Amino acid sequence: MFAAPYSLAAGARVDRRAPAWDISEWINWDPGNVDSLSGKVIVIDFFQLWCPGCNKFSGPLLAHWQQKFADSIADGQLILMKIHTVFEGHSYQTVRRLKSYIREKKIDLPVGVDRHADGERLPETMRRYRTRGTPEIAIIDRDGIIQFQEFGYFEPEPVEAMIQSMLVPTRA
């Protein structure tokens, strides 16, 4: 745990080990798994391609963070990724449409397709992370502990400060 000079909603603080994600296919590139990313800060955007909040909030926010934290991404300290976690509209939100959406939105982050177990309405990673819907963002610290997880809109500035506090300062 770290001392935090920022204010987050009490419900957003999680402090539990991040479960493995269960991905049927990676688009753009495969970032690895929670264990192989030990020592890195991980930001996951759980989204659906037809989700208004994802298109208006979490998608643009991750694009902003991709620029804001470009140095930390380049030196391997920070991984930003998206998981397409479909719990409704299964026949519309296909992998083919997802790939088209990724091209259209010019998303170059790793995008995982959350795996559905046979007969299950909710995909595996969504269940493991106990997400409440989309968009939902989870932030995992360098020790593999979920430090933040929030459904819907939140104030980005305190979360950006939290991410910054988890990164190792680079020497100039």
Task: Tell where the protein language model's regions lie, with residue ranges.
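N-terminal export leaders
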Residues: M1-F2
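N-terminal "domain-start" segment that seeds a small globular fold
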Residues: P5-D35
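Extracellular/periplasmic catalytic domains that process cell-envelope and extracellular macromolecules
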Residues: A12-V14, S36, I73-D75, R103-K106, ...
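Short active-site neighborhood of thiol/selenol oxidoreductases, capturing the structured segment around
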Residues: G32-N55, L80
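Loop/turn elements at helix/coil->beta-strand transitions in domains of secreted/extracellular proteins
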Residues: S38-I42, A74-I79, K106-P110, R142
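Structural microenvironment flanking redox-active thiols in thiol-disulfide oxidoreductases
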Residues: N55-K105, H116-E124
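Thiol/disulfide oxidoreductase modules built on the thioredoxin-like
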Residues: K105-I107, V113-M162
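Short, solvent-exposed cationic patches
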Residues: M162-A172
